[in-house]
């Protein structure tokens, strides 16, 4: 019994030593991490903090691009546009939230790419009545098309940069959102309503995220 007691006692103290060793290693690694962070330039630390505190940092890719589409709709609403004239364009844009089969990203990029103003306005002659109508729509919109085109381009480019190996909460696309808000402010266009934005902020995912019905956030659904 004495030997058993000694074995138990030695095992107990051995466990304490091992635990202390691992605990010490963890503390050491944490201190190294803090030292590296401290030695980073102030600008780098500030940029990291800005990214981590960005309200869309943990929002999925679908949620982020949806916000840009909402900004686009706010611009159309601000300038008194007839949403039925923009319906095809908006439906194609919003389909990014619900597509999920096959090469859905490539399909979306192809369909939306054909609707970008640089493609529409340089196609001569328009190869279909639909494209001709969209071309006339863009032309009539005049200089205000600068803002609309920039928002569409931001949404398109954001999706272009998506990939299956996107890292957790990839911060690269956040600058598209920041640019969109800056442009909206410069043009005097209000940002999207809080209710719709709150819904998007619940779409949290480290990558592209699960499909959802984004069209219900659109003014198209409110006018139907």
Regions found by a protein language model. Name each.
Residues 188-224:
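Charge-dense, extended regions
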């Amino acid at each position: 019994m004495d030997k058993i007691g000694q074995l138990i006692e030695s095992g107990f103290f051995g466990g304490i030593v091992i635990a202390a060793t691992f605990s010490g290693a963890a503390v050491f690694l944490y201190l190294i991490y803090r030292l590296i962070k401290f030695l980073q330039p102030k600008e780098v630390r500030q940029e990291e903090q800005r990214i981590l505190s960005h309200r869309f940092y943990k929002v999925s890719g679908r949620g982020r691009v949806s916000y840009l589409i909402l900004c686009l709709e706010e611009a159309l609403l601000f300038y008194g546009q007839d949403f039925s004239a923009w319906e095809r364009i908006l439906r194609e844009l919003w389909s990014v939230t619900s597509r999920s089969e096959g090469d859905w990203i490539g399909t979306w990029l192809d369909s939306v790419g054909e609707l970008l103003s640089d493609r529409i306005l340089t196609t001569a002659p328009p190869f279909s009545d639909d494209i001709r109508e969209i071309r006339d729509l863009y032309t009539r919109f005049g200089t205000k098309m600068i803002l609309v085109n920039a928002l569409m381009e931001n949404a398109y480019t954001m999706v272009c940069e998506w990939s299956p190996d996107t890292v957790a909460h990839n911060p690269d696309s956040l600058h598209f959102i920041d640019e969109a808000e800056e442009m909206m402010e410069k043009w005097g266009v209000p940002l999207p309503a809080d209710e719709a934005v709150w819904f998007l902020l619940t779409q949290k995912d480290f990558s592209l995220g699960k499909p959802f019905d984004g069209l219900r956030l659109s003014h198209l659904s409110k006018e139907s």
